[in-house]
């Protein structure tokens, strides 16, 4: 019983991995209302040159629905807002959906239409996402761009008096020299040097003490080693 259960679990795992590997990939298109979806699906000339091609939509829990299909003598086919063009010489199916609406959002695919057989999927599936183009955004962007261009002139006008005024330039040096020549500043400088000298002296004492302690330890060790060699 254990072996059968183990084999069953392994088989289920193998099947799930196989389905995941064979799952078709999707390509996402994000467009706004009124725009046009333009998709080109390649196919093998030798195998599907004379076959019919179709554009399908896939809804959850339903079979793929054919929205438009080419005829055997290939000509541009239009069904509503969907236009299909089959280029036999290049092995290419050109799909266009004009004047997109939010309701057009969904999963689509190009297929080789060969009923009663299952359709052969061409290219990657198309995940179409259509959003509403808000009319307020262009107006807001237009109002914001003049403000951006107005800021540089205001900054340059504010900076020009600072560079051209002679008073600000002549007043700055006397203040700086007077501050440096005051005795208070000299006292502060001596205080700073005193503060710096104290830790240096302490560090010298610590270093000398370290050397003395190391020399004492070395002499003790040397005496012990000599004593050990003496019979």
UniProtKB/Swiss-Prot annotation:
The chain crosses the membrane at residues 203-223. SMART domains: IG. Residues 224-231 are cytoplasmic. It holds the Pfam family V-set. Residues 1-20 form the signal peptide. PANTHER family: TRIGGERING RECEPTOR EXPRESSED ON MYELOID CELLS 1 (PTHR19357:SF0). It comes from Pongo abelii (Sumatran orangutan). Monomer. Homomultimer; when activated. Interacts with TYROBP/DAP12. Interacts with TLR4. Glycans are attached at residues 188, 191. The gene is TREM1. Cell surface receptor that plays important roles in innate and adaptive immunity by amplifying inflammatory responses. Upon activation by various ligands such as PGLYRP1, HMGB1 or HSP70, multimerizes and forms a complex with transmembrane adapter TYROBP/DAP12. In turn, initiates a SYK-mediated cascade of tyrosine phosphorylation, activating multiple downstream mediators such as BTK, MAPK1, MAPK3 or phospholipase C-gamma. This is Triggering receptor expressed on myeloid cells 1. Residues 134-157, 164-182 have a biased composition (Polar residues). It is found in: Cell membrane. Its main location: membrane. GO terms for biological process: adaptive immune response; innate immune response; neutrophil chemotaxis; neutrophil-mediated killing of gram-negative bacterium. The lineage of its organism: Eukaryota, Metazoa, Chordata, Craniata, Vertebrata. CDD domains: IgV_pIgR_like. Disulfide bonds join 41-110.
